[in-house]
A protein has these predicted regions:
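Short, solvent-exposed loop/turn segments that connect beta-strands within catalytic domains
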Residues: 70, 166-170
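Glycine-rich, Trp-frequent "lid" loop and neighboring beta-strands that shape
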Residues: 170-176
Length: 176
């Protein structure tokens, strides 16, 4: 990719870097942004970073400036989900009986991407529900989605209940 092609991606890199690495407790300096961009093969100057931050603000990102001592930094002040909301989502996923351990880990990783890397560390918590056994059935996630789709379309939903007999054959309850 030519240098000019990398330059066209600069604004996206600045946005991504701020979203992933900044929060109120961890503002990012212009020098840190320049170093990050240079590590990605993008040349940048202080003035162009200020212009990029202003463009992101015009786009609708809530980027705040703060001063710590003699150093100015920038951080994303508001996000789609605030940290307490993300904690609630993580707790709900962890305590859900019908979500497997594997899917729980996958969903939590996705939820963590909605916070800065510093805030994401606070989402690593374990919720224990006494006598709660997580399902081993990976397809239940998709079954719940199908049930929800049927309900939202006002369709009748029919279930066939069965048990396994001694010969490990399905034996339908109530005549199937």
């Amino acid at each position: 990719m030519a240098r000019s092609s990398f330059q066209k991606l600069k604004l996206l890199h600045v946005m991504n870097y701020l979203l992933q690495n900044s929060d109120e407790e961890h503002p990012i300096t212009v020098n840190q942004m320049i170093q990050y961009l240079e590590s990605n093969g993008i040349a940048a100057e202080r003035k162009s970073i200020y212009d990029d931050i202003e463009a992101l603000r015009t786009f609708g990102m809530d980027i705040e400036e703060c001063k710590r001592g003699r150093v100015f930094g920038y951080y994303v002040a508001s996000r789609t989900f605030e940290l307490p909301e993300l904690k609630l989502l993580v707790d709900s996923v962890q305590s859900s009986k019908f979500i497997t351990h594997k899917k729980t880990a996958s969903l939590i990783k996705k939820i963590e991407t909605l916070a800065s890397v510093h805030s994401a560390q606070l989402l690593h918590r374990q919720v224990f529900v006494k006598n709660r056994i997580k399902t081993m059935n990976e397809s239940i996630y998709y079954n719940v989605d199908e049930i929800h789709n049927g309900i939202s379309k006002n369709r009748k939903i029919r279930f066939l209940y069965f048990e396994y007999n001694v010969a490990k054959e399905r034996q339908y309850r109530h005549g199937g």
